[in-house]
C-alpha cells in the first residue's frame, strides 16, 4: 500500500501556510504584551492587515487605539507615520506638496512627501477633519498612489491605513463619506477594557 504525502510549499517570497500562521500568532502575542486584555481587538486589527486591507477603529478617547497602532508598527517593523486629524488640517498636509527651492541658480518645484508616505499610517481621529480633508486619503487607500499637481507618486508596499474615529455623538466630529467607509475592510468597535 503506497501512501502519497502532500507537502505544502510556498512560492518564492511567500510563507508556507504553517509558517504564516505561526508568524501571525507571534505578532499577536507580541502586540498582546503591550495591549493587555483586548485580545479580540488585537486579533481583528491584525486580521485586516493580514488581509492587506485598511481598518477603522471606533471608540471614545482613552481606550488605547493609538497605542495599538503604534505597537503594531513596532512589532512588524515597518515605517510609521501618524496624522492627527483636526478641523484645520488641509489635504496637502497629508499627501504632500510641491515646494519652490533654489537649485543651480534657478528656482524649481520639488515634491515634499507628506505623512501618507509610510507603510503603516495612523489616521488619528479621522472624523475630526472636514470631509474635503478626509477625502484626500481616497486615492492612496484605493490605488496606493498619490497625485499632486498632475504627477503620480506611488506608495511603497505594504501600505495600510489604520484609522481611529470618535463616536459621532461626540462634539466636533464629521461623518465619514460613504466612499471613505468603502475603503476599509471593516470597522472595529473598541470596547472598554
Predicted regions and their residues:
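Walker B catalytic acidic pair
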Residues: 59, 124-125, 136
Amino acid at each position: 500500500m503506497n501512501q502519497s504525502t502532500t507537502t505544502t510549499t510556498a512560492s518564492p517570497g511567500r510563507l508556507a501556510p504553517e509558517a504564516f500562521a505561526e508568524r501571525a500568532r507571534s505578532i499577536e502575542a507580541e502586540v498582546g504584551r503591550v495591549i493587555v486584555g483586548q485580545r479580540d481587538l488585537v486579533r481583528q486589527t491584525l486580521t485586516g492587515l493580514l488581509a492587506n486591507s485598511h481598518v477603522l477603529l471606533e471608540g471614545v478617547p482613552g481606550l488605547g487605539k493609538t497605542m495599538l497602532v503604534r505597537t503594531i508598527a513596532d512589532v512588524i517593523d515597518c515605517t510609521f507615520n501618524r496624522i492627527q486629524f483636526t478641523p484645520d488640517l488641509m489635504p496637502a498636509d497629508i499627501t504632500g506638496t510641491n515646494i519652490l527651492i533654489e537649485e543651480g541658480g534657478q528656482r524649481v518645484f520639488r515634491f515634499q512627501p507628506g505623512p501618507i508616505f509610510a507603510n503603516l499610517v495612523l489616521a488619528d481621529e479621522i472624523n475630526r477633519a472636514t470631509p474635503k480633508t478626509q477625502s484626500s486619503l481616497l486615492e492612496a487607500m484605493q490605488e496606493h498612489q498619490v497625485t499632486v499637481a498632475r504627477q503620480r507618486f506611488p506608495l511603497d508596499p505594504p501600505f495600510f491605513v489604520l484609522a481611529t474615529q470618535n463616536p459621532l455623538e461626540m462634539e466636533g466630529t464629521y461623518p465619514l463619506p460613504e466612499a471613505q467607509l468603502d475603503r476599509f475592510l471593516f470597522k472595529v468597535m473598541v470596547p472598554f477594557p
